[in-house]
């Protein structure tokens, strides 16, 4: 097996309606790689949002390539969103199990939530990503709205009970936090809402075929096996199950296919200022496509 690291795919090449290769770049030169079958496994699109917990290269490239090649995208609006650290240690996942021990306040010191909040925070501690199914959605909505009002986000402090006698599952998290980030329970932190994993993507059949001959897909680039909510950890199972299916299906598809073309035509597109366009897109997605959406905001986006 030949591994070409540090490359980016620019286009999927088709001949007679079948995917037969890809145009890639190493940043300096363009290369055409021909193939009898191709598997997309490029991940989601979390970094299209200003705040995201995934790496910066998870930007929906695979979905865009597939759409351009003739595939159908499904459930693209379904996004896994959860709290994370704004400071210190930006992009660190906030442990939802600690919600039951927290005092949440706006930057000016005002309480984030009104009224009796203990039962709400207790419920919020039972799930990681945001869900609209439970009353605990009020916690995520309040955090998100606070971030829109003040980019510093929400200040978190922990109860004496947790600091002096933390449950084992919380202690394990803070042991990791101290070793990996140099943080303790005593440190002041600010949190906000972060985009994470995509629950939508390229439509695939059970054998991972996409409807475009020669093209298969697996993992977070795909959609359809998850709804609006996805239990944490199922992305790994998704990748293992459908990754194996994609490999088998791609091998089987190669048996009755002729050799791919030796060359291809590629029409390059120039962009004036990609970084500014991308930053503007991230801000737009953060303001209009996070946990709170409405018709006006989505239309503006």
Segments predicted by a language model, with ranges:
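Feature captures the FAD/FMN-dependent oxidoreductase FAD-binding
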Residues: 1-26, 31-32
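General beta-strand structural signal in soluble alpha/beta enzymes
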Residues: 3-6, 40-41, 73-78, 114-115, ...
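Glycine- and aromatic-enriched mobile tails/lids
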Residues: 15-19, 105-121, 197, 203-217, ...
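Core beta-strand elements of the Rossmann-like FAD/NAD(P) dinucleotide-binding domain
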Residues: 28-37, 211-212
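Glycine-rich loop(s) and the adjacent beta-strand/alpha-helix scaffold that form part
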Residues: 37-91, 232-249
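An anion/pyrophosphate-binding glycine-rich loop and adjacent beta-alpha core
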Residues: 65, 71-183, 249-251, 255
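FAD/FMN-dependent oxidoreductases across multiple families
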Residues: 171-215
